Regions:
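PP2C/PPM-type serine/threonine phosphatase catalytic domain
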Residues: 1-179
Length: 179
């Protein structure tokens, strides 16, 4: 990942969460996500300045649920999956990556002093009882085949048991950090 990714990730998460909490009277919308992302860009720039690190970056994926509406936004290669028991996979975010000399390069992310690359893709969905939403980093989805990931998401087991399976597979297969 990016330099100081954990620091950048915490700054972005805290800024978006704070913006959402401070604006509960504003309905979820593309504009609300964009404004939260601007706050996150400012936060990562300030954190970079405070720590004398010119460069730090992170990806982001989020969901906000109001009633039966889910607003999903992401920047980078962190993903959101939306599955419905009767229909399977309804939606998966599209990674913001390009291949450069055989390497995957994240083309959009929160990166210090580069707010122009922190442009989120935003989608809204009507959700139903029983729908499953998974937010995860590339360290999780690259650790298992897509059919295994989806099967675990639709499993009737308690959430903790499903997360234990994800944790086991990531530790066994993965060489990347995961959330």
């Amino acid at each position: 990942g990016h330099s100081f990714g954990e620091v950048a990730s915490e700054a972005v998460c805290n800024a978006i969460s704070k913006y959402w909490q401070d604006n509960t009277d504003t309905p979820d919308s593309d504009q609300k996500v964009v404004m939260a992302c601007r706050k996150a860009c400012n936060a990562i720039n300030q954190k970079s300045y405070d720590l004398s690190h010119a460069e730090m970056g992170t990806t982001m994926v989020m969901v906000s649920i109001e009633g039966d509406k889910a607003t999903i936004a992401h920047v980078g290669d962190s993903r959101c999956y939306l599955l419905r028991q009767s229909e399977g996979l309804l939606y998966q975010t599209e990674d913001h990556v390009r291949i450069d000399f055989g390497w995957e390069i994240v083309s959009r992310c929160f990166f210090s002093y580069r707010p122009e690359v922190a442009v989120p893709d935003i989608r809204q969905f009507t959700i139903q009882k029983g729908d499953r939403i998974l937010l995860c980093s590339d360290g999780l989805y690259k650790s298992m085949a897509p059919d295994i990931l989806q099967a675990r998401m639709l499993d009737d087991k308690p959430l903790e048991d499903i997360l234990d399976v994800f944790d086991f597979l990531c530790q066994k297969q993965g060489d990347d950090n995961y959330t």
